[in-house]
């Protein structure tokens, strides 16, 4: 794969398009409906302009925006299987593409806050992956922690897809979990503002390298009268190098050819730096099969629900009160 993007379908692998959707300013349900139609128009236009594209990705918050005064209100929440996601499904079916979409999802438990959700829809119009953000961007985001783990699904061109949402990508264990379950193309949809621009680029690359998988990442772009969102869609090779890098332009379409079989081959044939294997097979030259116990205290503590940092008792911010959120839990912000 080169770094010039493409418009045609490669002989092997597939073509992806990541849309640097302009950050939407949303004040009403009608604004959300307009966004849904804008996303659908963009999907069809992208397929027309890039006829070989098989996967089109939209960033976090592209459907409902980031109106923090209203984002928890019932008026602003959507449901997987509701009319908005059904409209996305119909668009994917008409365009014959896979699509990745973001919604803020009503929690089935009315006593708990909503989820920050991503879905993948196939060219038949079927929702084939439903992911709920595991690590909300605390203390800003009020979303309930996801309960579906890190699912993986089949995608185009021999790919195994997983999707993480924004801050999830800063947690290396999530990328490793996706890879451990077979993912070879790790998608990241984000609504980051410029505070973490450098770290965005760094972690997109490191998630690829540590797990011998492609990463495809896309962020909102533009200004919403509070923050600037940096765009900078990025496609990384399984060796951690950047193949395609977007700029800060709203509406920029970042395209690239991806060859999942190459990542699969690296996982099968590499000796040096096959670190996802080495983690569970330490020193396999000296000890046949390697040592399966990595001796990692934090993993054992996580598994036992005993994870605690040495400095945790002295941390200053461990709830959402700095942003005016209640500290009692339960459903708030209706």
UniProtKB/Swiss-Prot annotation:
Molecular function as annotated in GO: formamidase activity; N-carbamoylputrescine amidase activity
EC nos: 3.5.1.49
Keyword field: Hydrolase
Ranges of residues in domain CN hydrolase: 14-260
Enzyme class (EC, first level): hydrolase
Pfam family of the protein (one): CN_hydrolase
Active site per the UniProt annotation: 60, 133, 166
Gene Ontology terms: biological process: putrescine biosynthetic process from arginine
Keyword Hydrolase: yes
Catalysis: reaction(s): formamide + H2O = formate + NH4(+)
Summary of the function given for this chain in its UniProt record: Is an aliphatic amidase with a restricted substrate specificity, as it only hydrolyzes formamide.
Family assignment from sequence similarity: Belongs to the carbon-nitrogen hydrolase superfamily. Aliphatic amidase family.
Full protein name: Formamidase
């Amino acid at each position: 794969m080169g770094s010039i993007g493409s418009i045609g379908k490669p002989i092997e692998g597939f073509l992806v398009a990541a849309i640097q959707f302009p950050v939407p300013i949303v004040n009403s349900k009608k604004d959300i409906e307009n966004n849904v139609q804008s996303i659908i128009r963009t999907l069809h236009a992208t397929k027309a302009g890039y006829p070989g594209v098989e996967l089109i990705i939209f960033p976090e918050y592209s459907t409902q925006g980031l109106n923090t005064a209203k984002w928890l209100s019932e008026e602003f929440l959507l449901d997987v299987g509701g009319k908005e996601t059904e409209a996305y499904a119909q668009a994917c079916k008409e365009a014959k593409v896979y699509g990745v979409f973001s919604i803020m999802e009503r929690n089935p438990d009315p006593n708990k806050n909503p989820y920050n959700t991503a879905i993948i829809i196939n060219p038949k119009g079927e929702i084939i992956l439903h992911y709920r953000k595991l690590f909300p961007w605390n203390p800003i985001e009020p979303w309930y922690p996801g309960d579906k783990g890190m699912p993986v699904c089949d995608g185009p061109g021999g790919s195994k897809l997983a999707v993480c949402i924004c801050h999830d990508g800063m947690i290396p264990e999530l990328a490793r979990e996706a890879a451990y379950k077979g993912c070879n193309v790790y998608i990241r949809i984000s609504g980051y503002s410029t505070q973490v621009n450098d770290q965005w680029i760094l972690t997109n690359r490191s998630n690829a390298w540590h797990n011998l998988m492609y990463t495809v990442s896309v962020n909102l772009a533009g200004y919403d009268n509070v923050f600037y969102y940096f765009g900078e869609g990025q496609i990384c090779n399984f060796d951690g190098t950047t193949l395609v890098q977007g700029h800060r332009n709203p509406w920029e379409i970042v395209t690239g050819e991806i060859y999942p079989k190459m990542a699969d081959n690296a996982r099968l044939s590499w000796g040096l730096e096959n670190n996802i294997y080495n983690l569970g097979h330490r020193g396999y030259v000296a000890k046949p099969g390697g040592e399966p116990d990595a001796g990692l205290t934090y993993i054992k503590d996580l598994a036992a629900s005993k994870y605690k940092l040495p400095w945790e008792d002295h941390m200053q911010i461990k709830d959402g009160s700095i942003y005016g959120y209640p500290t009692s839990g339960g459903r708030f912000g209706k």
